Amino acid sequence: MNHEVMNLFNPQSPAQTFDSIRISIASPEKILSWSYGEIKKPETINYRTFKPERDGLFCARIFGPIKDYECLCGKYKRMKYKGIICEKCGVEVTLSRVRRERMGHIELAAPVAHIWFLKSLPGRISTLLDLTLKDIERVLYFENYIVTEPGLTSLKLHQLLSEEEYMLAIDEFGEDQFTAMIGAEAIYELLASMELEKIANDLRAELSETTSELKQKKLIKRLKIVENFLESGNRPEWMIMKTIPVIPPDLRPLVPLDGGRFATSDLNDLYRRVINRNNRLKRLIELRAPGIIVRNEKRMVQEAVDALFDNGRRGRVITGANKRPLKSLSDMLKGKQGRFRQNLLGKRVDYSGRSVIVTGPELKLHQCGLPKKMALELFKPFIYARLDAKGYSSTVKQAKKLVEKEHPEVWDILDEVIREHPVLLNRAPTLHRLGIQAFEPVLIEGKAIQLHPLVCTAFNADFDGDQMAVHVPLSLEAQLEARVLMMSTNNILHPANGAPIIVPSQDMVLGLYYLSIVSEKEPGEGMVFSDIGELHHALENKVVTLHTKIKGRVKNIDKDGKEVAKLYDTTPGRLIIGELLPKNPSISFDIVNQEMTKKNISKMIDQVYRHCGQKETVIFCDRIMQLGFSHACRAGISFGKDDMLIPDSKLRLVAETEALAKEYEQQYNDGLITQGEKYNKVVDAWGKCTDRVADEMMKRIQAVEFDPKTGRQRPMNSIYMMSHSGARGSANQMKQLAGMRGLMAKPSGEIIETPIISNFKEGLTVNEYFNSTHGARKGLADTALKTANSGYLTRRLVDVAQDAIISAVDCGTAKGLTMQPIVDAGQIVASLGQRILGRTALVDILHPVSGEVILEGGAMIEEADVAKIEEAGIQSVQIRSALTCETRLGVCAKCYGRDLARGTPVNQGEAVGVIAAQSIGEPGTQLTMRTFHLGGTAQVVDSSHLEASYEGTVEIRNRNVVRNSEGHLVVMGRNMAILIKDGSGKERVVHRISYGAHIFVDDGDVVKCGQRIAEWDPYTRPILTEVEGYVGFEDMIDGLSVTETADESTGITKRLVIDWRANPRGADLKPAIIIHADKKGEAIAKYKGAEARYMMSVETILSVEPGSHVKAGDVIARLPMESAKTKDITGGLPRVAELFEARRPKDHAIIAEVSGTIRFGRGYKNKRRIIIEPNDETLEPVEYLIPKGKLFHFQEGDQIEKGDYILDGNPAPHDILAIKGVEALASYLVNEIQEVYRLQGVLINDKHIEVIVRQMLQKVEITESGDSGYIPGDHVDRIELDEINDNLLAEGKRPASGNPILLGITKASLQTPSFISAASFQETTRVLTEAAVSGKIDTLQGLKENVIVGRLIPAGTGGTIAQIRRIAAVRDDLIVDEQRKSGNNEVAKAMLTNMTTVTTVE
């Protein structure tokens, strides 16, 4: 009964359920149907009575009453008059909240154009009428007339006439022979008279005839818009408005401030402007004012409406009283402060608090300490309910009083309320999903939240004043989700790479490391202990120390659960750690019987998690944390200045390097090397010196010393312990403390040639200090900038991947990727095992020798399988990938593989796209914040030689070598590779060897591991001669194409090729070095039938004199490379963004599209033409134009393979896709992005990058439309195209064809099928305009759109609920059909009224 009475006063209208949202252009009739009345006056409210003015912007008659159930004049009050309209003031008696939903309208005296359809590119009005935007604006803003009906005159339709021309035309033809109009009326007439179907047919016909590409583009653009209008049922003339809707007054409130002033929404000012101008125009028309005045007023109305819809889009920005631009309707939606991002995608929530965090080492992993004061406030409603239920209070008011006075029973009840009620803790910035986790609260005194030390890594929290927010999940479902999904004990593994994230750090690591140290000659060495009790006894009586070498018996259980014991050589400390290990046959004492560095601890936790499950792991982690803290405290490790040992050999090493640097200086003075080469060599030498000093220092710090008095080992160096264990500090920082600081970088990224020889212990000189401040400040400035960049990258990634959800179990595709280990400069960077773990095998994996099946296709590759695969020596495995998944919406579980955060196959409904975006974005932010930790010390990244990484036999592919005049073997080929094979003939490693390198091995040689195979100069690119002969110069004209520069400091001259195209006289030159067969210099030597002529590019340094004798393989010229820049994620983050945005790099590589022979064609002024004649006769030759002066490797007649680089550089991803296909592109993007992160030591699983790349490759560009409705150039979803083509083929029609295209993440986000998602991302007005014209329907498939309309997202639990609803709907339909069939129409009707209807909201 109680409920019904309550509902009488506050009737809740049932929320309308809907399945999709449609957006279209509002017709004038629609606007009138929304409106509750016309607004005629610009007044808002009466400033004395505070009552709204009648017919004004806040009129109560139109919009509804100010107070609930009370008319304006006060004649009718209270519920009993509900629904009556007062005859005196005309106000309906109802709830005041209707003022939030009732709209009004303004009748305009002259039509105006809607600025979005006019100006938002491409301008819809101008494209439809096939006029330029300028012309349309001239007509709209009353500058020119436009001919709407030429009649029989010589005027053309749509011709623009100025005032004079119009008058002349009237004089010439007479007023009734033609019609020309001005203003929005003219455009309205033109749009209203358009026959869209006819125009569409004409355009299609014209398209099929035209050949010019430009014309085709223009026609396609216009045809698209015409088709959009036809399909959506919008009329073009609706883009010109005659009535303007006015939004409800409570959405643009007028709030009285104290002192009799008002704060108002900007929209009211903008509406007032429109009404004022419109009323003035009406009056002028009534008074029959002169045309020029009326026209001016009409223009003012148009401008006022423009400002209302989109202030500042055209003309001056309209400002308010305080010179601030007014916020128009568009500004309300746009940007970070707009409706979408401020209120719909992120809301402030109730039941939350924030406070400083402190460490809580005595907590269990699933607990957090919550201050009593906070808990009391957060759980108030629960406390009131419990007080009521227990009979302490009968009303909420009483309960409130009890709580405010903090009665003792309140605390008891608070204890009951929070028991088993998890709370969420969040630390900003929340970069990945581990930034919010659930804990069970433990009440504590004080005002700070206590946080468990092990979850700090996940939150990236420290206790230097960080704050965290607490949220209370209210409903039972929310509590359940918090407990099952978000509890800190359920988030042990990192979603980015599957490694444990709950790993001890800092003090805990130090404590465990200290426990696991072994020392020589400690008391009690060699004793044997049978169990842990004996050991503790011995330790307490100081018979042994923690580090003594002893033998200890360790008990474990075998596979049958029986207890087994084994004797180990170990130390008491290690036995103490081993005691905590869970008993399991798969976990041996060996994982503890080693130095417990952070890496090893992580491996240990991983093992425990994999074999013993989650519960054991959590208990184990808590225990080792306690142990670590307690022993770090007992060890009392600290360090002083004297712990930093400076190596004795430092002076000698520095002196040697100084001598070297002097020698390079001398070589430079003698003209043997250039300025750039000298710089590179000096930087290299100092880099090596720094490393050697650092190595010596490390050796000295690590050294084990014995005390001569006691004969015992001296305690280990504390700094070394901290760094080596991974607790704090790195080798790099130690190097700066006790070695030498080394080379510094300038803010531009160049390295300063003079190094900092001192370290921090010795102290820097003033000069050195100044040099080091240079790089350090850059680091700090970078940090601030890069944080923003990284956050923006994450936002774009989330946006592009948000609808990648696991939606099916198996898509059944036969496609996949081939995985191989990644080798860089002979080092295996990522092993095959790391890359395939947790993926699904595409086909059976067979043993290469015996042929037995190691793993069946379609099975998940687990740790045990990886071990078998690596044992068998398999080098490549085919796996399934999200990239090749064929699920329509989302990804299937088989293609995705293992859920890294759980270690099990991924569940349906998991939002893998968002996880991928977070995994890639989170380290970006982390790294950008870390650039300055090295204090700007430069790290030079470059290699100049190659060493064998395996023993084996050498095989050379595409062998092309010659011996030069010094007797070295020089590589002459472009794609030569050295393979090393092991005894069984299996390829172990492949190295591409660059042109001009010297190699020290030949085919069939046997090499040892670490033997040098080849070396090259990393700073210059050589140009070699392929024949023996005498040098001659061609087109080398002094001052035009060559300059002899004398170095100021040395006076030595060198010849340098300069840009000959800069001078008009040099336009036709082709500088080259030619090799003559004889001394006279007449005949030119031949090589493979072509003349030995070597084209020179700009900045080449000539190494030979004319007439000198050269042998094949000698260097005739060198092209200096960029000096070594330092590599840091600062270069890395923009690189990642560049790859994900699929931008063409500056100076990108040119890739050969076909395999064939190279020919040179006729060059242009500053381009060279290169033609590839394909080996395949059926193909046409392909031409490339290459800027002259760029280094071009090939000579005429060379063979080139498809996919080879004609010009070096970073390839453009689009070219890779077009030439080599999707798989090559995917592996290129994955490897490039991984390389950036690997440099920083960040591990991200490949599958995350693949998910993002999949989203970038969703679209196909239509090339042939066939019998489909597509237009060439349309971008269509590839799976949608496949479905449509299958239908077309089934009907015997011609299918459409297209090429896959790669979209950058921003473009791909804006092209999602959901306009709500796209509008909330970027370019809101453009997206909404486009969607409205084509009458788009958003089916609410992705996550973002559902958040915006306020529903559960279709992932996780929300996805399951949605699925249940779908099944229920199908079941209901079946029951209704059955009832109908059996004649129970009444029952069926009743059921139908109760069933949810599927509606589309407009």
UniProtKB/Swiss-Prot annotation:
Reactions this protein catalyses: RNA(n) + a ribonucleoside 5'-triphosphate = RNA(n+1) + diphosphate
Signal peptide span: none
Chain residues that bind Zn(2+) 2: 811, 885, 892, 895
Cofactor(s) it depends on: Mg(2+); Zn(2+)
Lipid metabolism in keyword set: no
Enzyme class: transferase
GO MF: DNA binding; DNA-directed RNA polymerase activity; magnesium ion binding; zinc ion binding
Entry EC no(s): 2.7.7.6
UniProtKB keywords: DNA-directed RNA polymerase, Magnesium, Metal-binding, Nucleotidyltransferase, Transcription, Transferase, Zinc
Pfam families, alphabetized: RNA_pol_Rpb1_1 (PF04997), RNA_pol_Rpb1_2 (PF00623), RNA_pol_Rpb1_3 (PF04983), RNA_pol_Rpb1_4 (PF05000), RNA_pol_Rpb1_5 (PF04998)
GO BP, one annotated term: DNA-templated transcription
GO cellular component term, pick one: DNA-directed RNA polymerase complex
InterPro entries referenced in this protein's UniProt entry, alphabetically: DNA-dir_RpoC_beta_prime, DNA-dir_RpoC_beta_prime_bact, RNA_pol_asu, RNA_pol_N, RNA_pol_Rpb1_1, RNA_pol_Rpb1_3, RNA_pol_Rpb1_3_sf, RNA_pol_Rpb1_4
The UniProt record lists the keyword Zinc: yes
Cofactor binding comment, as recorded: Binds 1 Mg(2+) ion per subunit.
SUPFAM superfamilies linked to this entry: beta and beta-prime subunits of DNA dependent RNA-polymerase
Annotated positions binding Mg(2+): 462, 464, 466
Chain residues that bind Zn(2+) 1: 71, 73, 86, 89
Subunit organization: The RNAP catalytic core consists of 2 alpha, 1 beta, 1 beta' and 1 omega subunit. When a sigma factor is associated with the core the holoenzyme is formed, which can initiate transcription.
Function statement: DNA-dependent RNA polymerase catalyzes the transcription of DNA into RNA using the four ribonucleoside triphosphates as substrates.
Record family assignment: Belongs to the RNA polymerase beta' chain family.
Protein name in UniProt: DNA-directed RNA polymerase subunit beta'
Organism field: Bartonella henselae (strain ATCC 49882 / DSM 28221 / CCUG 30454 / Houston 1) (Rochalimaea henselae)
Lineage of origin: Bacteria, Pseudomonadati, Pseudomonadota, Alphaproteobacteria, Hyphomicrobiales
Name of the coding gene: rpoC
